[in-house]
From Swiss-Prot:
InterPro entries from the UniProt entry: Osmotin/thaumatin-like_sf, Thaumatin, Thaumatin_CS
CDD domains: TLP-PA (cd09218)
Full protein name: Thaumatin-like protein
Organism: Arabidopsis thaliana (Mouse-ear cress)
Sequence intervals crossing the membrane: none
Swiss-Prot/TrEMBL keywords: Disulfide bond, Signal
SMART domains membership: THN
Domain of life: Eukaryota
Length: 243
């Protein structure tokens, strides 16, 4: 994993013909972000599961063939020299290197599954929102569309879903309705555990209008999941515009 200029790296990606996929984590936020990486069951742990990414910096990471997992951004983090500390959002057990642990909701997620012929990827708000985030394929074949949430949902988050800073002055994250109310209707569980009975709610519709290219609830598949073949990927925190 190396810190590099994004535009140089994008050029290198276009020249790459390697069979393995590469992902760039690019931080366009005005503050540091600590990316978290959680592999799916049975998959390799990458980069210890987390690292610091300063503002306007990029890091590259090679994904093993057929790898699957999720990425998210932590912010407001402080860690000591041993890598122990805490993040205001997306914390993974108080560790710089998440070591396979997931992020504490609410957190925006980018999910990817590399297939032998076709990759599947998405950005999900099912576990809530903390940072604007996108995932975009580079040099792939097929539909290869953009997935992400550019809008700042913290600015439009309903009061019942808000997570505020310690001093209470600002909203730092926005819970999903499932996390906030723990209801089968919002969580798509029990009698609502299928696409026919679990429909968009007033809360998920707020997310969907603001971020039409992201999952707003568990069965939001048709407009949210993207596919591409033999691509590399750029995961951007705080993207300024849709691609």
């Amino acid at each position: 994993m190396a810190s590099i200029n994004l535009f140089l790296f994008a050029f290198l990606l276009l020249l790459s013909h390697a069979s393995a996929s590469t992902v760039i984590f690019y931080n366009k936020c005005k503050h540091p972000v600590w990316p978290g990486i959680q592999p799916s069951a049975g998959q390799n742990l990458l980069a210890g599961g987390g690292f610091k990414l300063p503002a306007n910096k990029a890091h590259s990471l090679q994904l093993p063939p057929l790898w699957s997992g999720r990425f998210w951004g932590r912010h407001g983090c402080t860690f000591d020299r041993s890598g122990r500390g805490h993040c205001a959002t997306g914390d993974c057990g108080g560790s710089l290197s998440c070591n396979g642990a997931g992020g504490e909701p609410p957190a925006t997620l980018a999910e990817i599954t590399l297939g032998p012929e076709l990759d599947f990827y998405d950005v999900s708000l099912v576990d809530g929102y903390n940072l604007a985030m996108s995932i975009m394929p580079v040099k792939g074949s097929g539909q290869c569309s953009y997935a992400g949430c550019v809008s700042d949902l913290n600015q439009m988050c309903p009061v019942g879903l808000q997570v505020r800073s310690r001093n209470g002055k600002r909203v730092v994250a926005c819970k999903s309705a499932c996390s906030a109310f723990n209801s089968p209707q919002y969580c798509c569980t029990g009698l609502f555990g299928n696409p026919q009975s679990c429909k968009p709610t007033a809360y998920s519709k707020i997310f969907k209008v603001a971020c039409p290219k992201a999952y707003s609830y568990a069965y939001d598949d048709p407009t949210s999941i993207a596919t591409c073949s033999k691509a590399n990927y750029i995961v951007t925190f705080c993207p300024h515009h849709r691609h």
